[in-house]
Swiss-Prot record:
GO terms for cellular component: cytosol; DNA helicase complex. Residues 9-289 form the UvrD-like helicase ATP-binding domain. It comes from Rickettsia felis (strain ATCC VR-1525 / URRWXCal2) (Rickettsia azadi). GO terms for molecular function: 3'-5' DNA helicase activity; ATP binding; ATP hydrolysis activity; DNA binding. It is an enzyme of class 5 (isomerase). Belongs to the helicase family. UvrD subfamily. Its EC number is 5.6.2.4. This is Probable DNA helicase II homolog. Pfam families: UvrD-helicase (PF00580), UvrD_C (PF13361). Signal peptide: none annotated. Keywords: ATP-binding, DNA damage, DNA repair, DNA replication, DNA-binding, Helicase, Hydrolase, Isomerase, Nucleotide-binding. The keyword Glycosyltransferase does not apply. It catalyses: Couples ATP hydrolysis with the unwinding of duplex DNA by translocating in the 3'-5' direction; ATP + H2O = ADP + phosphate + H(+). NCBIfam families: pcrA.
């Protein structure tokens, strides 16, 4: 355990300045690889060490559970600091709502559950169908995106202005949004957007509750501030408005999530929001070589809307940036696969320390083929995460309906899994009955069974299901969660259904369920597990053992990671910068594309390759390509520019 002077002396001068600033608003502009996590954790340790606040009065907010866990571990390695409030925006908001939900007078209780993205979309689809909305004109997925964006902006249906509903699609979305919120409240469930949205409503309508949390959280630290949306920004600003001891850490040059609601303006206007704010820049980079940093700085300097900063390093040496022209995207993939094979065979780098970062998903196919042909192990980062897999979501739905019998979405997911001969007509009859009486579908089934409204085979299967759900509900209050979930798997017939399939896929699903049971066994309270799984689904970053495999992933997914060698393919106009971004967002879109380029360049520690093709196959058509403008922004003196075609030139001399 270090004492105060020990951990302060491990910091560079700018880092020390940030750690020792303990009063008033602070914006910490932390460039890529400049040690921001070290500064954040040292700052928390210093606040506690100086007795400026107890750990319970410090709130640190991150965007992922992984980042929150890492921050807590690193703080505790510096100083005994138990009781800190470290978590994601959603987890902290959920905690506050569980304590204060009754003050919103929405009919919710503190046992509300948090529904997943898929369940949100299903509810939207159900409402669209019920309202007889033309899905060809008004796609449910698009309606759901609009509703989510409104929530990110802090807008409930009642707060939507005329300008928010100018277009026919927006007017339809508002109609669905109103019904969507009613359904959530009836079911005693919330979606992720509601957590902060209702937090802010709680604070606005109950000043005394806001004051309580302002007193509780006297020091606030927010990581990745450039990625915050409007509702997150408003939440943080309200909490910090009393003591103003807020430290926001971020890099406007790495704001690349505008497409999902992030507002780079939040970090750019920090000084206006918090009068007298101090701004400290972390510019000494500990990750990359000088040529890599020079390339990144020269590219990003072309953006106008940014806080000026220049990364530097005391490491003078470094490989020049390789910029390679290839005649096609297939040749580009073959060249990169061959170069990686050479780097690995010559023992210059391990395959696990090499990454290919693409701008768009369609670029990956040619690399898969090239690596298969060269027998190079590779890993494409993507696919379904654990808690998004079908069988896991099914079991979660069984648990949710057992805990909260008003959860319509959970009931509808499992009512015919395994098959119970409950047809669409019976389901619709239940929905209509419930809506007319403003009750949940489960309550409707119970009443309809008692009144003889359900006949023939559905009567027996529904009666059996209701009896079992009631039994599981009771058992959860007296038995260990793991025992009840095992009973659910057996009694429902779900496990038997998978076992009878006798396919590799079914066996894989059973293995996943067993893994889920191992996770449940770690929780004494099933509600804690449900909340944990919901928050993990929203924030989880795919964990991959890079081992000896080359990593292929998108530039967006690579943010926060680093590799010895990085290949950046497809640097062509229309591909990168994306033509769609330019067409839809103009100059704003171009600046975000340039920030994505900056993120890609700064992932490299030692070696960086940028490639572009003379022609590219896009949607089955071969298109002539031109080098990206971002390539022209990199100075010639730090690059080696070659063509993968030079080795073939001798064959065409006459």
């Amino acid at each position: 355990m270090l004492n105060n002077q020990d951990f302060i002396h491990t910091l560079n001068p700018q880092q020390q300045k940030a750690v020792l600033h303990t009063k008033g608003p602070l914006l910490l502009l932390a460039g890529a690889g400049t040690g921001k996590t070290k500064v954040l954790t040292s700052r928390i340790a210093n606040i506690v060490h100086q007795n400026l606040a107890s750990p319970q009065n410090i709130l640190a907010v991150t965007f992922t559970n992984k980042a929150a866990k890492e921050m807590a571990e690193r703080v505790n390695s510096l100083i005994n600091c138990y009781g800190l409030n470290i978590g994601t925006f959603h987890s902290m908001a959920a905690r506050i709502l569980r304590d204060q939900i009754e003050h919103l007078n929405l009919g919710l209780n503190n046992r509300f559950t948090i529904i997943s993205h898929d369940d949100q979309l299903k509810l939207v689809k159900d409402i669209v169908k019920l309202k007889d909305i033309d899905t060809k004109k008004y796609a449910p997925k698009l309606i759901h995106i609009i509703i989510s964006r409104w929530k990110d902006q802090g807008l409930l249906p009642s707060k939507l202005s005329a300008s928010d509903t100018n277009l026919p699609l927006q007017r339809v979305a508002k109609l669905v949004y109103e019904e969507y919120q009613k359904n959530l409240l009836i079911s005693n469930v919330l979606d992720f957007g509601d957590l902060l949205l209702y937090n802010n409503e709680l604070f606005i309508k109950n000043p005394e509750i806001l004051r309580y949390y302002q007193e509780k959280y006297r020091y606030i630290l927010i990581d990745e501030y450039q990625d915050t949306n409007v509702v997150q920004y408003l939440w943080a600003r309200m909490l910090a408005s009393l003591y103003k001891n807020i430290c926001c850490v971020g890099d406007d040059d790495q704001s690349i999530y505008g497409w999902r609601g992030a507002e780079v303006g939040n970090i750019l206007r920090f000084e206006k929001d918090f009068a007298g704010a101090t701004i400290i820049k972390l510019e000494q980079n500990y990750r990359s070589t000088l040529p890599i940093l020079a390339a990144a700085s020269n590219v990003i300097n072309n953006n106008k809307n940014r806080h000026g900063k220049t990364l530097w390093t005391d490491r003078e040496s470094g490989e020049k940036i390789k910029i390679i022209s290839c005649w096609s995207d297939k040749e580009e993939a073959r060249y990169i696969a061959g170069e990686i094979d050479k780097l690995v065979r010559e023992d210059r780098y391990n395959a696990g320390n090499i990454a290919i970062l693409v701008r768009a998903g369609f670029q990956t196919r040619s690399f898969e083929e090239a690596f298969i042909n060269s027998a190079m192990p590779y890993k494409i980062i993507g696919g379904l995460r654990f808690y998004e897999r079908m069988e896991i979501r099914d079991v979660l739905a069984y648990i949710r309906i057992s805990l909260n019998q008003n959860d319509n979405l959970a009931l509808e997911r499992i009512i015919n899994v395994p098959k119970r001969a409950i047809g669409a007509a019976s389901l619709n009859k239940i929905r209509v009955y419930a809506l007319e009486r403003n009750i949940s579908n489960f309550a409707a089934i119970k009443e309809m069974l008692e009144m003889g409204e359900i006949k023939a085979k559905p009567y027996e299967t529904l009666k059996d299901l209701v009896t079992k759900i009631d039994n599981w509900h009771e058992r959860f209050s007296i038995d260990a969660p793991i025992n009840v979930v095992k009973a659910i798997l057996d009694d429902s017939g779900y496990l038997e259904m998978l076992q009878e399939e006798k396919t590799e896929e079914a066996f894989g699903r059973i293995e996943n369920i067993n893994e889920m049971l191992r996770a449940i066994a770690e929780f004494n309270d099933i509600h804690d597990f449900i909340e944990h799984s919901s928050l993990v689904m929203e924030n989880e970053v795919l964990e991959t053992n890079y081992g000896g495999s080359v990593t292929i992933m998108t530039l967006h997914a690579a943010k926060g990671l680093e590799f010895d060698v990085v290949f950046l393919p497809g640097w062509e106009e229309g591909v990168f910068p994306s033509q769609r971004s330019l067409d839809e967002e103009g100059e704003k879109g171009l600046e975000e594309e340039r920030r994505i380029a900056y993120v890609g360049i700064t992932r490299a520690k030692k070696d960086l390759y940028i490639t572009h093709a003379e022609s590219r196959k896009i949607f089955y058509e071969i298109v002539r390509s031109y080098p990206s403008r971002f390539i022209t922004e990199i100075p010639d003196e730090i690059t080696i520019r070659t063509s993968s075609m030079k080795k073939y030139n001798s064959f065409y001399k006459f």
